[in-house]
A protein has these predicted regions:
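Interfacial helix-start motif at the membrane-water boundary
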Residues: 39-41
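S-adenosylmethionine/decaboxylated-SAM
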Residues: 43-44, 48-218
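N-terminal auxiliary segments of SAM/dcSAM-dependent transferases
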Residues: 1-27, 32, 37
Length: 218
């Protein structure tokens, strides 16, 4: 999750944001309420252009079955669910009752509560309990860095051919480039190499927000 793109030259992020469809009043209200209720946590939300991109992608795919790992206060899940087919279902994985209580309130306001299934608990356990087979259209991973490879390995086999996996914060604010990365940065670096070597997908790492990997199941 990230607010803006710190990897671009000064002024470029503002220009990109200014030339992308802006969030509506509900998403603006959610962002503001998140900042009020959880000071210092605002960076955990995706950027507005990332939300627009994800909603567009879900719509272009006609996604009906999706999963999100890491929901926070619900901004990204609203973007995904809005783009999905009207009969679609989004499964959201998170461990925080406090954060997701705000998400639930805004899902209700957005008219999406019936299309989003929140599952509280360790995400790896939730993913392992999902049906087997290739049935997922879309997945978004935006959670603890140490768990990225584990989440990936549970999700990839469940993706249908042509399904898309999005992974956020793959640049980790530039920390992955440090000569002696800390444990979190090292986990992201190792995940990036793991995903790149996975012959079940083709992928591109995009300079959206704090780095977004887009992988298509072959």
């Amino acid at each position: 999750m990230s607010d803006g793109n710190e990897h671009l030259a000064p002024g470029v992020d503002d220009y990109l944001t200014g030339h992308s469809t802006p969030p509506d009043a509900l998403l603006r209200d959610l962002k503001a309420e998140t900042a009020r209720r959880f000071p210092g946590r605002g960076r955990m939300q995706i950027s507005q252009e990332q939300g627009t991109f994800m909603s567009m992608l879900a719509g272009l795919m006609g996604a009906r079955h999706a999963v999100e790992v890491g929901t926070f206060t619900g901004y990204s899940s609203i973007c995904l669910a809005r783009g999905m087919a009207t009969d679609g279902k989004l499964i959201c994985c998170d461990i925080s009752q406090e954060w997701t209580s705000l998400a639930r309130a805004y899902w209700q306001k957005a008219g999406l509560a019936g299309r989003i299934d929140l599952r509280l608990g360790p995400a790896l356990d939730t993913l392992r309990a999902l049906p087997g087979g290739a049935w997922l259209d879309l997945a978004f991973i935006d959670a603890d860095r140490a768990g990225l490879t584990g989440y990936w390995e549970e999700i990839v086999p469940r993706m249908r051919p042509g399904g898309v996996i999005l992974v956020d914060n793959v640049l980790l604010h530039g920390r992955i480039f440090e000569p002696e990365p800390d444990a979190e940065a090292l986990a992201v670096r190792q995940f990036n190499e793991h995903a790149l070597a996975d012959d079940r997908v083709v992928l591109a790492m995009l300079p959206i927000a704090d780095g977004l990997t887009v992988a298509r199941r072959t």
